[in-house]
Amino acid sequence: MRIVLDTNVLIAAFVSRGTCHELLEHCAIRHRVVLSPFLIAEFRTALVRKFRFPASEADEAAGLLESRFENVTPPPLRESVCRDPDDDHVIAAAVTAACECIVTGDRDLPDLRAVSGVRIVSPSEFWAFEAG
């Protein structure tokens, strides 16, 4: 399955060894993870500003993501579908890469449930689906 992992899931995977870390490892092995330059830049910026990572470590983490996962540069959406315009970048990446789902901890995105055939799920909903 082709999946976009939202920035908040990626950050949680890197800063703790919890659910999101396990989810990232699982998806890296079993699925095709798709990212975009916007998601990677947002990830790097959050590590430095919010979590006080040294820039060199944030660059290394971002480089690891770029080397391990597919990277797409989506065109902007024709119309905004999210309250937060940054969330439109997540949707655009998933639609451009023909992903089946977006995994996010963002409370606004799951309210949409699906956009252009892309399901939007929380990490716990993703695990429930995988346990199937």
What are the language-model segments listed below?
Residues 100-101, 107-132:
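Acidic, PIN/NYN-like endoribonuclease modules and their adjacent C-terminal/linker elements
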Residues 41-42, 77-82, 126-131:
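A short acidic, often aromatic-flanked loop/helix-cap motif at beta-alpha or helix-coil junctions
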Residues 1-35:
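Short, well-structured N-terminal submotif of metal-dependent ribonuclease cores
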Residues 12-14, 46, 112, 129-130:
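Residues that scaffold the ATP/ADP-binding catalytic core of kinase and kinase-like folds
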Residues 26-78:
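PIN-domain endoribonuclease scaffold, especially VapC-family toxins
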Residues 67-102, 107:
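Active-site neighborhoods of divalent-metal-dependent phosphate/nucleic-acid chemistry enzymes
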Residues 6-7, 35-36, 105-106, 122-123:
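A secondary-structure boundary/capping signal
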Residues 17, 40-41, 109, 127:
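Alpha-helix N-cap/helix-start and coil->helix boundary motif
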